[in-house]
Curated annotation (Swiss-Prot):
InterPro entries, per database record: DUF4645 (IPR027891)
PANTHER family: PROLINE-RICH PROTEIN 32 (PTHR37343:SF1)
Positions of region (Disordered): 59-80, 97-119, 143-171
Top-rank taxon: Eukaryota
UniProt name for this protein: Proline-rich protein 32
Protein's organism: Mus musculus
Length: 284
């Protein structure tokens, strides 16, 4: 029986051997080494050379130069340092002031129209301005579509009184109140500081002369005899019949005693006679 190597002679690593008999039938033979020791050592050296050699890349090397982490510069940006001259600074400040003033004016015009009363001088006429820019003495500071109608208001028809304290005394009109004639002298309203007092005159029958008022009053009529009164009707007074209106009643007025059974009370009787009083019937 002869065994042949399956594959290339001396280069096969397979341990399987296929024997060939006379009838050229193939049989497998295991665990049979056909290679020599020299060939095996040569294969080990080739493997060591493969592992020790550096890897060879198929592509050419692509190296990017790294100069550090930097932000790429804008090619459109100016590369020279920016320096401000005094002329540029003044121009920028003026531009900023103009922009701020225009912004404030636009904000003021967006609001609702407000009525502003202004009087520049004490002697100048009062002016009424409805919205828009400030109005001077008949001259608009700004002209154009933004200007509002200017309405001059004469002095006599102003909404507010003119400046300055103008104190006027009350008119010289005598006033009659409650039978007292009061006359106030024209002048300053502060009468207490100057010592001016109002002149008060009382008509006839005033509290200063009570006798005149008592004499002018009609005689008090006597009441007719009333049954049940303990006193006679000659000593009881009735109130007067609607006397004239007097704001200062000083004289006492006699009233009739109430209708009750018993001795009358002293405050209700102006004149009473003790001899004419009789004891009540239930005391007898």
């Amino acid at each position: 029986m002869a065994c042949t190597e399956n594959g290339l002679a001396g280069h096969s690593h397979s341990p399987i051997i296929v024997p060939v008999d006379k009838n050229r039938s193939k049989e497998t033979c295991h665990n049979v080494q056909l290679r020599s020791l020299s060939s095996m050592l040569k294969d080990d050296e080739d493997d060591a050379d493969v592992w020790t050699r550096p890897p060879v890349s198929l592509r050419p090397p692509f190296n990017v130069p790294r100069t550090g982490a930097r932000i790429p510069q804008n090619p459109r940006a100016p590369r020279h340092p920016l320096t401000l001259t005094p002329a540029i600074e003044e121009e920028s400040l003026a531009t900023a002031e103009i922009n701020s003033s225009e912004g404030l004016e636009s904000q003021s015009q967006k609001g609702h129209d407000s009525i502003n009363m202004s009087q520049e001088f004490s002697g100048s006429p009062m002016a009424l301005m409805i919205g828009g820019p400030r109005v001077g003495s008949r001259v608009l500071e700004r002209s154009g579509n933004n200007s509002k109608p200017y309405i001059p208001v004469p002095r006599s028809q102003g909404f507010f009184p003119p400046r300055g304290s103008q104190s006027r005394g009350p008119p010289y009109i005598p006033t009659l109140r409650s039978g007292i004639m009061m006359e106030v002298t024209p002048g300053n309203a502060r009468m207490a500081n100057r010592g001016n007092m109002a002149h008060v005159s009382f008509p006839l029958g005033s509290p200063r002369h009570p006798m005149d008022n008592w004499q002018q009053s009609p005689s008090l009529p006597l009441s007719p005899s009333i049954t049940g009164l303990p006193c006679s009707s000659a000593h009881c007074f009735l109130p007067p019949q609607a006397p004239a209106f007097n704001p200062f009643p000083v004289m006492p007025t006699a009233f009739a005693s109430p209708l009750r059974f018993g001795p009358p009370l002293l405050p209700y009787v102006f004149h009473y006679n003790t001899g004419a009083m009789y004891p009540p019937p239930y005391l007898n």
